[in-house]
Amino acid sequence: MNYKANIDMKIIRNSIIPFKGFCAINLFGVIFARHEAYLSETVLNHERIHTAQMKELGYVLFYVIYLIEWLVRLLLPGNAYRNISFEREAYNNQRNSFYLERRKSFAMWRK
């Protein structure tokens, strides 16, 4: 099995991270979820895709690029968050449970 498809993630439930209004956030391959949040398979797959992206680029570089892209997209029309390349890949494929088995390297920047 492809290493990208077999991504186990630790889940930490708490009442601080993420902020209210969000159910989960992936920080360095660890899911932080609110106590009351239901983590569907779709949400978990979305976060698995982010973990694959992080491992591919390295955690620090992932966050540097993510932040820069978000700041640039704030100046452009549309939803800055949803238009970040990492988020587009994750949202477009979060319902495909086999996506990580066939994901190509640097898929977030491929058409």
Predicted regions and their residues:
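Residues at structural and domain junctions
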Residues: 30, 50, 75-76
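Active-site recognition of the HExxH zinc-binding catalytic motif
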Residues: 42-54, 90
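Hydrophobic transmembrane signal anchors and adjacent membrane-proximal interface regions, especially
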Residues: 3-5, 9, 37, 44, ...
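Short pre-active-site segment immediately N-terminal to the catalytic Zn-binding motif
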Residues: 21-44
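Metalloprotease/metallohydrolase-associated module, dominated by Zn2+-dependent proteases
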Residues: 1-22, 26, 57-111
